[in-house]
Amino acid sequence: MLRIAVTGSPGVGKSTVVAKTAEKLAEKPGFKIGGIRTAEIRKEGHREGFSIRDLATGKTGILSHVKGSGPRLGKYHVNLDDLERIGANAVRNALACDLVVIDEIGPMELISQSFVSAVEEVLESDKPVLAVLHHSSRHPLAQRFRKGFEVLTVDKGNRDELPEKITNRFLRKLG
């Protein structure tokens, strides 16, 4: 079973690598991708938070925002409702798909025990996984990814070629 996690500095393109890889794999007829993707929420050039999207259903919510009432992490408030309703459910439901995508295993997501439990269910399965791993997280779940996954570091020199390389690895392994 192929399990790849990409890591690297903030803003280097980890989520973009995973998104481009998932898009390429989704072109394969009958190939189902499930899981989550996060993206920046920007206003007037400033990052105000992050959205979270269920890759299978397209359902979108707010993961975190500068304005909010959830647990605070840096300048953001984590929206536990959307993280659990959309994020944790998307990860659990992805067990019925051909590939589980998790963007990201990072401090915001790891605040939710429901999300952590959903990811642990995936790790206990035999499903192929493609994940974004926060570069410095010391959470026990992040450590499991570092030990059990092939970890690729994204940088400006390889970020354009990685989606194709990762796609080809999954296609060879999954037939």
UniProtKB/Swiss-Prot annotation:
CDD domains: RecA-like_Thep1
Record bears the keyword Mitochondrion: no
Gene3D superfamilies: P-loop containing nucleotide triphosphate hydrolases
GO molecular function terms listed in the Swiss-Prot or TrEMBL record: ATP binding; ribonucleoside triphosphate phosphatase activity
Enzyme class: hydrolase
Record keywords: ATP-binding, Hydrolase, Nucleotide-binding
The protein's Enzyme Commission number: 3.6.1.15
Listed Pfam families: NTPase_1
InterPro entries recorded: Nuc-triphosphatase_THEP1 (IPR004948), P-loop_NTPase (IPR027417)
Residues noted as binding ATP in the record, renumbered to the chain: 8-15, 99-106
Catalyzed chemical reaction(s): a ribonucleoside 5'-triphosphate + H2O = a ribonucleoside 5'-diphosphate + phosphate + H(+)
Domain of life, source organism: Archaea
Function, as annotated: Has nucleotide phosphatase activity towards ATP, GTP, CTP, TTP and UTP. May hydrolyze nucleoside diphosphates with lower efficiency.
Protein family: Belongs to the THEP1 NTPase family.
Protein name: Nucleoside-triphosphatase THEP1
